[in-house]
Amino acid sequence: MAAERGAGQQQSQEMMEVDRRVESEESGDEEGKKHSSGIVADLSEQSLKDGEERGEEDPEEEHELPVDMETINLDRDAEDVDLNHYRIGKIEGFEVLKKVKTLCLRQNLIKCIENLEELQSLRELDLYDNQIKKIENLEALTELEILDISFNLLRNIEGVDKVTQLKKLFLVNNKISKIENLSNLHQLQMLELGSNRIRAIENIDTLTNLESLFLGKNKITKLQNLDALTNLTVLSMQSNRLTKIEGLQNLVNLQELYLSHNGIEVIEGLENNNKLTMLDIASNRIKKIENISHLTEPQEFWMNDNLLESWSDLDELKGARSLETVYLERNPLQKDPQYRRKVMLALPSVRQIDATFVRF
């Protein structure tokens, strides 16, 4: 297949970006969030389960036979090369691509990152869904800005410290247990480590340009070591083991905060986060809406699946003049026969209550 530029490739690029946005939400909550939030913040439960099943496959059980690279005709002048699901077993023969900027090798049978030294103009490398166990041999890719090695078999973050121009790093659904070896990535804007085995937020204080941090579906017990990330606008921590909202005082530019599926009991610690437009605290153990009356920018408020009983708590949201979406279902107050009517009366700006739009 000749790898060519054009309308077809542009469409492929757009599909890759949509895929990557979805994987960036690896925190796994209600599918409705994908429709109501400005950026996709969660992977649907079914997609997450499918991904887990893929990620846990034993590569030794793989019955597909690798393709012979000599049967693939590469366009030497191509800037964008998409070889998604080609049964490629080894990275080889790509040295002819002197002009390539984007190389997509998704859903192949690759076990090792190798033979990329000649691709010095490469800016995006996509190795999503392969059988890679180690990040290595990237030193020559000095122009690389986007790297995706999600859904592989990685256990450590390594081999990226020399790729100092990286802006986006995706390592979703691996077996990583520690955040490390990222201190040289001063240009990094997005870091996605969802669905791993991480227990602590650490070793990210030099990532001062970071704008989006996704750590959903890990084993993190505490919000900490975030003080240096003053440019952070999106923080996603769903499906961890958090019990308290804390450590966010320096995140004055934070706009979207996702804390669903944890063990949080009290809304607190948001005194300095005045730019929040999205607050997701669904599926926790919270009994009361409090300590957020100073937030005037929220457009979405997710507090479904908690322990909210009192209608007077909704007064805490009246300062949010742009509030359009609230999720309060599966709280005790939903048992009220006038549930939707009372929400509308308390929050007249709201246009969507749970999954249903308000009719006037």
Swiss-Prot record:
Alphabetized, the UniProt keywords read: Acetylation, Leucine-rich repeat, Nucleus, Phosphoprotein, Repeat
SMART domains, A to Z: LRR_SD22 (SM00365), LRR_TYP (SM00369), LRRcap (SM00446)
Gene Ontology cellular-component terms for this entry are: nucleus
Where is it localised? Nucleus
Q: Where is the composition biased (Acidic residues)?
A: 53-63
LRR repeat windows:
77-98, 99-120, 121-142, 143-164, 165-186, 187-208, 209-230, 231-252, 253-274, 275-296, 297-318
- Would you indicate the residue range of the signal peptide? none
Question: Which InterPro entries does the record cross-reference, listed alphabetically?
Answer: Cilia_flagella_integrity, Leu-rich_rpt, Leu-rich_rpt_4, Leu-rich_rpt_typical-subtyp, LRR_dom_sf, U2A'_phosphoprotein32A_C
Chain positions covered by the region annotation Disordered: 1-64
Which SUPFAM superfamilies does the entry mention? L domain-like
Give the modified residues of type Phosphoserine: 12, 24, 27, 44, 47, 322
Identify residues that carry N-acetylalanine. 2
- Main subcellular location: nucleus
Locations of Basic and acidic residues compositional bias?
17-34
Q: Give the function comment from the record.
A: Regulatory subunit of protein phosphatase 1.
The UniProt subunit note reads as follows:
Interacts with PPP1CA, PPP1CB and PPP1CC/PPP1G.
By what name is this protein known? Protein phosphatase 1 regulatory subunit 7
What organism is the protein native to?
Pongo abelii
